[in-house]
UniProtKB/Swiss-Prot annotation:
Gene: xseA
Main EC class the enzyme belongs to: hydrolase
This protein's name: Exodeoxyribonuclease 7 large subunit
Organism listed in the record: Pseudomonas fluorescens (strain Pf0-1)
EC number(s) reported in the record: 3.1.11.6
Catalytic activity: Exonucleolytic cleavage in either 5'- to 3'- or 3'- to 5'-direction to yield nucleoside 5'-phosphates
Superkingdom, natural source: Bacteria
Length: 459
């Protein structure tokens, strides 16, 4: 520690600028608080793209900014989040640009309930992955249990509340306490032994109960050994640990979770008044069913008595029924015979129509008809095609360039054979070919003005 930091920094003789003040304050802070541990709760957690981690560490009365640079952040195993209680180690420094002091951290560890909460989440995830929380493993509670084992502390309000509920709702149920510690170093082992003992006693159901407390107080119910002992129980088990807001690993593994020990007792203690009403309802239903059964038996007996008194009537009824069956059978046989006869006639008719001789005669008749129609069709087709050809030849002659030339016109062609359409395409002295309706002439351009062109014949 520095005994006289002001004398060391020369603050008694020198007037400093703000930058100098912040710089010397940073040196002083880093020298005095170079390696310290601080405990608090994370808030305002930020993770920029640089990989550094920034957050505020606070308690009920104050807060301080913290910086965890990338190389140190990579060594932190637990996931940091707002609300997590942690212990941090680092040095106090000053951000000179703003004059804010902050902690430059090299280590972050969970603290208090924060460490327990991380362990809780890790075990919960592990057991869930193994299927210990699945609905298929849950055993339904008995509707009317007679013997119930209670695993809890022999002292305190929990056992008194459970007994009070059973005395009020189901005094006939036999309760057996398997005493165990529910807090402290020995609690886990004692709870595991109590669960094994209770499961071997053949109870109808078990209650695992404890009153409220902090996460640390209830921690034995979050131990893996207790969770696996609960899962191994064949007897249906209700977990009632802590208050309604408390949740333990044993709650997830048990067959049923009750928010409080009293609620667990109510789940397993059927209301006596309800049972009485249920018995009365069953009695009324039984009486009604017995009356209905007696009535049906009486009617049946009367019917049997009537049949015994008149056997002749029964024989007459049977004879009449036999005659009716005989008539129905004869009519059915006749219908079948007529149906088969009609089908045979239809088949014979179809067979005659398919006879080869008849088919051959039909084909020969059709062939003669086609042979007679073929010459006429060919002559008519040729006549139509000849008329079409003559019409097309006349149309072609009308639009033919030769027909135009025959009327006194000519076509002028240059030496490359291109048609001359106006005087601008020619020049004086150019030799051209004039194609007439009959024959050709060689001509020479004498004048190529837009006035009519003067041509002269070549010798």
């Amino acid at each position: 520690m520095i005994k006289d930091p002001f004398a060391r920094l020369g603050l008694d003789r020198e007037v400093l600028t703000v930058s100098q003040l912040n710089g010397r304050a940073r040196v002083l802070l880093e020298d005095v608080f170079s390696n310290i541990w601080v405990e608090g709760e994370i808030s305002n957690l930020a993770r920029p793209a640089s990989g550094h981690v920034y957050f505020t560490l606070k308690d009920s009365g104050a807060q301080v900014r913290c910086a965890l640079f990338r190389q140190n952040a990579a060594r932190v195993r637990q996931a940091l989040k707002d609300g997590l209680a942690v212990k941090v180690r680092g040095k106090v420094s000053l951000f000179e640009g703003r004059g804010d002091y902050q902690l430059i951290l090299d280590t972050v560890e969970p603290a208090g309930d924060g460490a327990l909460r991380l362990a809780f989440d890790a075990l919960k995830e592990k057991l869930s992955a193994e299927g210990l929380f699945s609905a298929e493993r849950k055993v339904p509670l008995p509707a009317h249990p007679q013997r119930i084992g209670i695993i809890s502390s022999p002292t305190g309000a929990v056992i008194r509340d459970i007994i009070s509920v059973f005395r009020r709702r189901a005094p006939q149920v036999q309760l057996t306490l398997i005493p165990t510690a529910v807090q402290g170093r020995e609690a886990t082992a004692q709870i595991v032994r109590a669960l094994k003992l209770a499961d071997a006693r053949g109870f109808d159901a078990l209650i695992l109960a404890r009153g409220g407390g902090s996460l640390e107080d209830l921690w034995c119910f979050n131990e893996e050994a207790v969770a696996r002992a609960v899962d191994a129980c064949v007897t249906p088990i209700v977990s009632a640990v802590g208050h309604e807001t408390d949740v333990s690993i044993s709650d997830f593994v048990a067959d049923v979770r009750a928010p409080t020990p009293s609620a667990a007792a109510e789940l397993l203690a059927p209301d006596s008044s309800h049972l009485i009403r249920q018995v009365e309802s069953l009695h009324r239903r039984l009486v009604m069913r017995m009356r209905d059964r007696l009535m049906r038996d009486r009617l049946r007996l009367e019917g049997m008595t009537r049949r015994l008194r008149h056997p002749g009537e029964r024989l007459r009824q049977q004879a009449q029924r036999l005659d009716d069956l005989d008539m129905r059978m004869r009519r059915a046989f006749e219908r079948q015979l007529n149906t088969r006869r009609e089908r045979l006639i239809r088949l014979e008719t179809r067979l005659a129509g398919q006879h080869p001789g008849r088919q051959l005669a039909l084909l020969r008749q059709r062939l003669d008809s086609l042979a007679e129609r073929l010459p006429r069709a060919m002559n008519e087709g040729l006549k139509r095609r000849r008329l079409q050809l003559q019409s097309q030849m006349q149309t072609l002659h009308v639009v033919s360039p030769l027909a135009t030339l025959g009327r006194g016109y000519s076509i002028l062609l240059d030496e490359r054979g291109n048609a001359i359409r106006n005087a601008a395409q020619t020049h004086t002295g150019q030799r051209l070919k004039a194609r007439l309706g009959e024959g050709e002439l060689q001509v020479r351009v004498e004048d190529n003005h837009l006035t009519p062109v003067t041509l002269s014949l070549l010798d």
